[in-house]
Amino acid sequence: MPGVRKRGEEIREFILANITDNKNIAALTSQQYAISLPAVYKHIDRLVLENQIIKKDGNFFLQSKQYKYVYDNNKTLSEDVVWEKDIKKHFSGVPKNVWNIWVYGFMEMFNNALEHSKGKKIRVVVEENKLFTCIFISDDGIGIFKNIKLNFNLLDEKDALLELEKGKRTTDTAKHSGQGIFFTSKIFDNFMIFSNGITFDSKPEKKHQINTNAVKFSTLVYMRLEKNSFKKIRDVFDEYSTESPGDFDKTIVPVRMANTNDLVSRSQARRILGGLELFKDVILDFSGIEDIGQAFADEIFRVFPKMYPSTSITAKNANENVQFMINRAINTKL
């Protein structure tokens, strides 16, 4: 019965691949393969017996291993030493492209905690299972969104989410380019930052089951990547380059991150535009935005291009109402 055996293996692989981000994995599998729930649970029971998944509090999870490290945030601590001493051993045998992504992401995020958090402790948790590896980096400092709010004089900590989406925004221009979080968030399969009840999520359309209660923190960074990922750092860098490969001169800004329901004023527009003059190509993503005001549109699509003619600013995913206001602003002759 090779056909039946192959189908069973396919079903179990589906369960393993989707169990982390789906609480009701049985229903999802039943729907995907048009089989009964009892049939699905036979496959789940087999995976439990094989020690590939575990059941906890009524939910199923991939069997995983955790490794925890705690560091004093002092002048002798550095991200490269931590990587060499404790972290890199967890990635022996992974493809070169996966290795490169983890080197880049870990170094950037650990350094961020080291130099920006103003905390006393930095904690790292490496969690790995059959399919992917996760790293959690947490600190007990000021909190990333609060730090950004104070440095950029923002109205609310939630406004910091928009600044992170822009890129080239940093609280320490002398030492940092503002590219670390931006590119790290794009490179990984999943990237999230938790701080003071606020979440920055690089993949908000996906459902995540992440336990943030295991450790007290001011900021917690979560990175996840499949062990056999085909992603390459170069491809992500090139995606945000318009001319020379590797030049970070393009950005895509989701307008929904503006932390307001009514986008009507010039002040709101200026907050979105802050720092975007540093790019050659700016794309504003209007997904989820129902309407915008005349003054808001005019500031972005008429005033800003006159002030910064070397920066191209365009819109995507604009509905009919939004596009009407954009066209009206572009065609205004003064």
Predicted regions and their residues:
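Short active-site-adjacent structural elements
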Residues: I292-A295, F324
